[in-house]
């Protein structure tokens, strides 16, 4: 299964990242109060998907890249 992991972004109340899969569509991420916590959670998500045998995990660095890969 392919997953696209978005960059950490500022949101109301903190920082978050989103994920997208062809099967489930967009999954909004939890909002963390500290940017360090959001980056840590994003890295854990990327590693856990890779370890579970995900066919392809793509970690995006920019919003433009995330949008381009999810349309």
Question: Over which residues does each language-model region extend?
Answer:
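A short, exposed loop/beta-hairpin motif centered on an aromatic-Gly-Thr core
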Residues: 24-36, 58
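Basic, amphipathic alpha-helical segments enriched in Lys/Arg and hydrophobic/aromatic residues
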Residues: 43
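Short amphipathic alpha-helices within nucleic acid-binding modules
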Residues: 38-40
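Short N-terminal "domain-start" leader segments
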Residues: 1-18, 47, 53-71
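Short acidic, glycine-rich loop/turn motifs
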Residues: 19-23
């Amino acid at each position: 299964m392919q997953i696209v992991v978005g960059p950490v972004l500022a949101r109301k109340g903190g920082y978050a990242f989103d994920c997208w899969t062809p099967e489930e569509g967009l999954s909004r991420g939890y909002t963390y109060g500290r940017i360090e916590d959001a980056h840590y959670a994003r890295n854990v998500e990327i590693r856990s998907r890779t370890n579970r045998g995900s066919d392809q995990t793509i970690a995006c660095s920019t919003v433009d890249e995330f949008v381009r890969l999810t349309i």
